[in-house]
Every structure is written in structure tokens, then in C-alpha cells.
């Protein structure tokens, strides 16, 4: 089936039998898989994803390091299709890739470092539930929301297949971390007494926004003793003051950011 969207596609096409394992095996052999099963990026599925954005397939979203691959909307859609992204979530994938490509985000350092750091996506806005972006129990892993699992994975696949980030080759990460498969979660705006992260950054509450943060993993803090907000705040403050990861280095410790999730 040829559509206006697919008629302008330029990516190489391959033909495989209908066995779903065939594509999985090929992705591992060719090096453009992440070790987990992928969905076939057929013309029909790509067309549905492309229809969710006003940009043409050849629109350049950004240049992704470490090999400075030019990421077009088409290439982003192919990787999103393999990750299982539903069309309505594709604009968030594009927004995340655009943010990562911004020079001030320093994605080259992130994709080549020996550290475990990787893009962590924080979603705000009214579409969190509809897209399956987790922000309640298990939001950092295990809640099984489609948006959380596939949006983060699509960004990871784009960095791998367009940017050329591969562990042991262009990426020198020593241990990596589970979030390198993809990490995307939302803010529980309805329960928070404060303006949302996106509102504090100048966006409206009715806008769907994704913030990209270079995260190095999670550090759980459980408090079962304190009853007052003041005591809890004291425990949190004393805990995050501990120089984890690169925070003991200068100037990283003076300029780095920490994401604190409270529930």
C-alpha cells in the first residue's frame, strides 16, 4: 500500500518471511537491535506514525552523536516502529531527539563517556494516561505502560542506529545501566502541590512536554520512621548531599542536576 507518506521514504527496505523471530534474529546479526524483540517497521506502520507529525519524512530532527548521524523524521519513525511506539506518542520521541541534539546538551560526551549516564525522559501534560506513561507506582520500572517502555526505547534505538552509539565501540561505558534500554516516566502532577516541571520551565499545563535529563541511575531512599514533613525533608537533604557518581568532581559537582522523585 503506497501512501503520500510512504511514497517519499528513502530508507533501505528488506524482505523477510512472516516468522516474527526472523526479524529479531536479523536485528541482532546486523547490530541494529538492542537485544530485545522488535516489531517490523512496515510501510503501513511507518505511514501511521508519520501521519502523527506535520513534518515531512526528510525533515531533519537533529544530528546525533557520536558519529553525527543525521536523524530525519523518517529514520526516527523507523526506529519508533521497531520499538512499538504508537503514533500519538511519536511527537514526544521527536521532541526528545531534538532536545538531545541541542549543542548545549552535550550529547557527544554522554554517548562516548565511560560513565553509565543516559537520556532519562520526564513527561508532563494531559496525554500521560492516554499514552501509557507511568507516573504512579513503579513509574521508574515495572509498571508496564506502553508509552514509558516504547518512547524511551525509540530514543535509545535512534542513538544506536542513527548516532552510532554502541557499547564497547563508540560508547566506552564500563558497566552501563538498565535504563540504557530506555527510561521514560511522567510527573504525578495531580498529586503535587507545586507547579509541574514543565510549568517551571515556561510551558502551559495543557501542553505535552518531555524533558531530557542525563541520568546515571536510581538511588532508592526509604523512610519508615519520620512522621513530619520537616523530618522527611531533613532526611532527603542529608541523603542527596552524599557525593554519588561524579558529584565529587569539580566542576561537575557545582553544575550537575539531580532529579528527586517523592511519593
Please tell me what each predicted stretch does.
Residues 1-263:
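Non-transmembrane, aqueous-exposed alpha-helical and coiled segments at domain scale
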